[in-house]
């Protein structure tokens, strides 16, 4: 491993630790902040994939219609950290409706991708209740780059460690913890 990769590994570890600490300071336990981070990571990664597809289409002089565009794109709402209460209100209200509503006027439509999003976001929730805290977590997640191989490898290692922490913190639960199948399937399908 070279120095640049090792340095980025440490940065990514610190980013995730900061996000976890922020969620923990709000009273969110390990089991719930793993879920919280998973859906935030997913939206950030999806936005990066959309940006990449948009750029590729531009090179071919073709139009690309983003599935989460305008105010619904991570690259738009996640930058609103100067107004954290507005950001949290937007995510809990408008964005969540966009991600979960089967109504084509309110949601993403009724095609396969929209149905995948609904399956994911119908089964998770936003545990942040304070705008300032939520904005700090979003700022940390925004520092990650899912198009960077080092970030993805380190995040997968960190995710495994977080799952171990959840297992250790959850004395009442037995067995191993796994990422829910619908989340794995959706992530694979979106990436493909």
What are the language-model segments listed below?
Residues 1-191:
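Non-catalytic, mostly N-terminal accessory regions of nucleic-acid modification and defense proteins
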